[in-house]
Amino acid sequence: MADEAHFDVGDKMQNRPPRSRGDRGRGKGGGGGHGREVQVSKALSKLLRHQAANAGIQLDDEGYAPLDAVLVWGPLRSLKVTFDDIQSIVTSNDKQRFTLKPNTVKNPSLDTKSTTPADYLIRANQGHSIKLESAALLAPMTLEGGDVPERVLHGSFFYFWPRIVESGGLKPMSRNHIHCSTGTPEEGVVSGMRKDAELIIEIDVEASLKGGVKWWLSDNGVLLTEGDEQGVLSTKYFKLVTGRKVDVGVLWQDGQWISDLPAGLKISPPFGKGPRQGGGGGGGRGDRR
């Protein structure tokens, strides 16, 4: 887990707000400030979660990369991202998806007033497809530790539900983990569930822990699991499955099928996910996180 000398970062819920042509610059012309921040955080996510090796950037065991190397990566360099930009994301974003901390090699005094990128390391707190050891990146959640939340929820979509059932549960898909939250966006939870999720799958975490499934907690409060040895979080651990905004009745309860989705329900792939992105796990992300 991150040490005490660090900054937490959020990379806004990337709901992809409509973009005008004037939104592509460095915050000039077209009111692009917000749009540029989203561009920067998306680029950071892509690099630190998925593309570090391809970019020639070595992550340490905890998923950290040298900030100076990150800032010269092509997409970020083309955006002319500065240390101030990174620090702004660290201090002002709500999703807390990144952590920035002093580089103990180049900044042994752990000076957090430095504005030199080489003095810092940065990581994505979760959402990786790059293989990292969960124990180095995340805090374990155990029955013995008494830290199992009262509710653990996974957000999914009508489109994926039949495949979730057919495959026997949720899967990480292209990510290392299935992502869950302790509540919904309406309840003020900002990490762990997409704002457009249509289904709420409540997980019986205690039963799954007893069944040998490992659970983890990220620095930004996202609950994560790799599933069982086959990479599946079984439907037998589905405590309750209901619609989030549209009443579809109870689909699953206490590990048992109750009903199918209602006939005539409007079903379409969620934004940013389609037949190629879908699959048995319903995307594994549950947010956008």
Which residue stretches match the model-derived regions?
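Eukaryotic, polar/proline-rich low-complexity intrinsically disordered regions
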Residues: 1-289
